[in-house]
Amino acid sequence: MRKKSPGLTMLIAVSLLAACGSGEGVVERRPKTPVPFVAQISINEVMVAQIDHAAHFIWEAANPENTAIEVQWREVEHHAIALIASGSAMTMGGTGVNDAMWVTQSGWRDFVSQMNAASVQALNAARDRNLTALGSAGDNLVESCEGCHQQYKPSIPTEGLMHPH
């Protein structure tokens, strides 16, 4: 029979105690919180260059005079996705004078959430090739945009930016 080494037995015992310990003094590894990204453009620039452009495409596609065959469904999908992605940009702020203030307000976040929900609705309508659902999504998008503009952007245009629509 082999004789066990007292040093090895002690090492195993200490290791087991450490493994079964209370965890005090153990450093937890948590994912690092990313530093918030702030765009090098203003929220208004995002609205004019991306949101307005995408929303108008959806509104034009949802025109009741169109037939489902006439609608460019893949383009509607692309514009709905652009709107969904823009929602994130609308919550991060930017270089505009009011951007930092807007993104902290619950009303602002509510309007962004409404825009996002309408955009997801438009995306689903496009994927289903459903003109009626696209019209409903367009109406909801108008409601979120107009409500937000009335509260946060009563004087159009701001920052000297204009859109072609």
Residue ranges and their predicted role:
Residues 1-10:
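Bacterial N-terminal signal peptides that target proteins for export
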Residues 17-19:
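C-terminal motif of bacterial Sec signal peptides marking the signal peptidase cleavage site
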Residues 4, 21-24:
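Extended hydrophobic/aromatic-rich secondary-structure runs
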Residues 23-165:
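Sequence context surrounding c-type heme c attachment/ligation sites in exported
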